[in-house]
């Protein structure tokens, strides 16, 4: 009998912690909303909307056996172990700096109490500590990281099957909250606008991957650069919340080449984008101040402007620049923005308005359903020119907006 602590792994398939916990006989699956340790990195409002609906879907898959709680995970897990006489806990690792510190402390303290903790990699293809240069230092440039550190390393783990049967321990002495008591949904109607643009949950994630591979990966290499085209996977929120594993996505695309489907350039490009996701998490692991400090220290004295009117106009999609405003309005309405548009609106903020990249990072954190601490902070530093493998600070993002400005999000039809 064991506890399976759910974090950013809201799925049954290819879930190492769940699979191993299930072998102990029976499990108690618990999700804990950590409001103690996350501090300034607590999930943003759009992310909370997604999390609410995704937890609801996962609970259905668990036959409504999922336990919900809110507070300090160490206290809650300790209480649950005591009340149900459990001495084993399983979880999949997460890699935000505050999570790493918390989990290390919990693991050490549980060991002192005679409780065994088992942790697994369920969210990355390669562990950060396994990808280092010959001199033992971390990479700061993507291409050698990806080609030498990843593609020439041990192949990622193949996806695991979903457990055929899960036995649930009947919890008698611990009171679960309801999903609604987690208070994830904002009071205003914005949440309905956000969620109406998406199908949420593990089954939706698998369907999205299958649809992408079937109809949209052909032409991905070039099409991904044009917001008006559909050559993007839109898998980022599903990956962030662990509704699908990166291993499942990786091998679904990798195996297209093995089976003779002739989209080699498109599949290679998509896999390299998966590599960028890995690289972002890798950078955050080795440079934990990435969300708030310039990776390149020479930018520390840059003379940023501090203009709240400019910032508000950018946030509201009222800059007067059609492609920027279309992107920002799409973000507010759907919780998502095409990656090319993220580069354009980000470049406009830091290089045209001269506002600090942290302002953009904070706004995206609150508005994106796929807001990921690693990707968000490394992406903004890349745009500003102060990060790893960054675009030159004087290079301004450009794009033809002719088609985009006719989109439903543009205020200038």
Give the residues covered by each predicted segment:
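Hydrophobic alpha-helical scaffolding
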Residues: 41-44, 48, 132, 195-199, ...
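Alpha-helical packing segments of well-folded alpha/beta enzyme cores
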Residues: 17, 54, 58, 205-208, ...
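Glycine/tryptophan-enriched, flexible segments
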Residues: 115, 137-294, 400-402
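Soluble or luminal CAZymes and related metallo-dependent hydrolases
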Residues: 50, 54, 201, 319, ...
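Active-site-proximal binding-pocket segments
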Residues: 115, 230-402
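Trp/Phe/Arg-rich N-terminal binding region typifying the photolyase-homology
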Residues: 1-157, 329, 375
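Positively charged, low-complexity/disordered segments
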Residues: 403-413
């Amino acid at each position: 009998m064991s506890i399976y602590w759910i974090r950013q792994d809201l799925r049954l398939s290819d879930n190492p912690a769940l699979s191993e916990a299930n072998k102990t006989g029976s499990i108690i699956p618990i999700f804990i909303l950590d409001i103690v340790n996350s501090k300034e990195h607590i999930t943003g409002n759009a992310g909370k909307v997604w999390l609410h609906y995704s937890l609801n879907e996962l609970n259905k898959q668990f036959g409504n056996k999922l336990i919900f709680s809110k507070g300090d995970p160490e206290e809650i897990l300790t209480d649950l172990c005591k009340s149900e006489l459990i001495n084993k806990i399983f979880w999949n690792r997460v890699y935000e700096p505050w999570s790493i510190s918390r989990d290390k402390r919990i693991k050490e303290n549980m060991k002192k109490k005679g409780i065994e903790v088992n942790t697994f990699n369920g969210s990355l293809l390669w562990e950060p500590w396994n990808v280092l240069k010959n001199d033992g230092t971390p990479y700061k440039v993507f291409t050698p990281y990806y080609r030498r550190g990843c593609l020439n390393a041990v192949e990622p783990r193949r996806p695991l099957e979903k457990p055929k049967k899960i036995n649930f321990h009947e919890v008698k002495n611990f009171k679960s909250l309801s999903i609604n008591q987690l208070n994830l949904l904002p009071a205003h109607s914005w949440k309905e606008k956000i969620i109406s643009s998406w199908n949420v949950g593990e089954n939706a994630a698998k369907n999205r991957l299958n649809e992408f591979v079937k109809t949209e990966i052909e032409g991905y290499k070039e099409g991904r650069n044009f917001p008006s085209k559909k050559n993007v996977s839109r898998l980022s929120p599903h990956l962030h919340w662990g509704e699908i594993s990166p291993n499942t996505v990786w091998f679904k695309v990798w195996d297209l080449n093995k089976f003779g489907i002739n989209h080699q350039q498109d599949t290679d490009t998509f896999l390299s984008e998966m590599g960028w996701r890995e690289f972002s998490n890798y950078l955050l692991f080795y440079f934990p101040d990435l969300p708030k400090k310039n990776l390149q220290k020479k930018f520390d004295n840059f003379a940023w402007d501090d203009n709240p009117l400019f910032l508000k106009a950018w946030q509201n999609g009222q800059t007067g620049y059609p492609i920027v405003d279309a992107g920002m309005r799409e973000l507010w309405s759907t919780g998502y923005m095409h990656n090319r548009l993220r580069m354009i609106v980000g470049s406009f903020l830091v290089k045209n308005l001269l506002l600090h990249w942290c302002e953009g990072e904070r706004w995206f954190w609150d508005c994106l359903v796929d807001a990921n601490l690693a990707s968000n902070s490394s992406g903004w530093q890349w745009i500003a020119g102060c990060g790893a493998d960054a675009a030159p600070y004087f290079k301004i993002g450009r794009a033809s907006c002719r088609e985009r400005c006719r989109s439903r999000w543009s205020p200038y039809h």
